[in-house]
Curated annotation (Swiss-Prot):
SUPFAM superfamilies: Class II aaRS and biotin synthetases, tRNA-binding arm. This is Phenylalanine--tRNA ligase alpha subunit. It is found in: Cytoplasm. Pfam families: Phe_tRNA-synt_N, tRNA-synt_2d. Tetramer of two alpha and two beta subunits. InterPro entries: aa-tRNA-synth_II (IPR006195), aa-tRNA-synth_II/BPL/LPL (IPR045864), Phe-tRNA-synth_IIc_asu (IPR004529), Phe-tRNA_ligase_II_N (IPR004188), Phe_tRNA_ligase_alpha1_bac (IPR022911), Phenylalanyl-tRNA_Synthase (IPR002319), tRNA-bd_arm (IPR010978). CDD domains: PheRS_alpha_core. One of its GO terms (biological process) is phenylalanyl-tRNA aminoacylation.
Length: 346
């Protein structure tokens, strides 16, 4: 059998075997056996060394035609096998689209977010604007502009996270008082704003303290603002948050940036003022600090304190949420325990 006959015989056997191949592994093995480096065609073509110059091109062309034909049929067979595998998988893994799907668990806003939104809604209804501030603040705005110069003894009241000697994590949202007054055009009217945000203190975390918590600063500055305006504002806000039958008690206090300063207590919502474990049997619960803006704070913003006056207050979101919902450990707000948070989902 000459080379031409051997190639034709190999061609017929290869194409016949190709028709019966049913999987990709067998298909690849067939290509290796017939056309690989050690395959049958390679062995046949080793005999070309004995051919004449006229015979070699004929045999070479015949071998190339066989390779091209096999390559085309190989690719077609490969597609056929892949399609068969896919069809078999579809038949064995049929999806019943009428079956109910997996229900997605409903999420909700965090309880502190809800509390902040409720407070913001109350103040927006009273004509206040909401402003954002810097969590990384300067010593100048955090302390000095709040009537706390570098040698002021009241600085010992707060432990501070300092980044540099002049840059720190703000210890309260009060710096927004100065920043907002600096930017406000009082020739167009007074200022009414609240500034919610995170603040930081070097506290040891426990059931009632956290190194990070939330405050909402409130500020009103205009002509003829009095303590009566502060009292009326806070009375309205607290009754909206805790119920219309709540009463407020005002106690003298001290804050460097307000004068006079007060601590505001709310009548206990559990016992109605009779005394219980929530109010420590006093009938009252401390809720916030407030006061009239100190003349020095006004003057440092370029305002004439004999013409302008104002009041300021600070609300703690965590404290309000803890009192409203009977939560006794502040750490629950930050630990991300869904079992705790979903109780207050809305």
């Amino acid at each position: 059998m000459n080379l031409q006959e051997k190639i034709e015989d190999l061609r017929k056997r290869t194409l016949s075997d190709l028709l019966s191949v049913a999987d990709e592994k067998t298909l690849n093995n067939l290509r290796t056996v017939m056309l690989g480096k050690k395959g049958e065609l390679t062995e046949i073509l080793k005999g070309m060394k004995d051919l004449t110059n006229e015979e070699r091109p004929v045999i070479g062309a015949l071998a190339n035609a066989f390779r091209d034909e096999f390559g085309a049929k190989f690719e077609a067979k490969k597609v056929e096998i892949e399609q068969a595998v896919m069809n078999a998988a579809l038949e064995s893994e049929t999806l019943d689209v009428t079956l109910p799907g997996k229900a997605q668990k409903k999420g909700s806003r965090h309880i502190l977010t809800q509390t902040q939104e409720e407070i913001e809604e109350i103040f927006l209804g009273m004509g206040y604007e909401i402003v954002d501030g810097y969590e990384v603040e300067t010593d100048h705005y955090n302390f000095e502009r709040m009537n706390l110069p570098k040698d002021h003894p009241a600085r010992d009241m707060q432990d501070t996270f300092y980044i540099t000697n002049e840059v720190l994590l703000r210890t309260h949202t009060s710096p927004m008082q100065a920043r907002t007054m600096d930017a406000h055009d009082f020739s167009k009217g007074g200022l009414r704003m609240i500034a919610p945000g995170r603040v930081y203190r070097r506290d040891t975390d426990d059931a009632t303290h956290s190194h990070q918590f939330h405050q909402i600063e409130g500020l009103v500055v205009d002509k003829n603002i009095t303590m009566a305006d502060l009292k009326g504002t806070l009375d309205l806000v607290m009754k909206k948050m805790f119920g219309q039958d709540r009463e407020l008690r005002w106690r003298p206090s001290y804050f460097p940036f307000t004068e006079p300063s007060v601590e505001v207590d709310i009548s206990c919502f559990k016992c109605g003022g009779k005394g219980c474990n929530v109010c420590k049997h006093t009938g009252w619960i401390e809720i916030l600090g407030a006061g009239m803006v100190h003349p020095n704070v006004l003057e440092m913003s370029g305002l004439d304190s004999s013409v302008y006056s104002g009041f300021a207050f600070g609300l703690g979101q965590e404290r309000i949420a803890m009192l409203r919902y009977g939560i006794n450990d502040i750490r629950g707000f930050y630990q991300g325990d869904v079992r705790f948070l979903e109780q207050f989902g809305k």
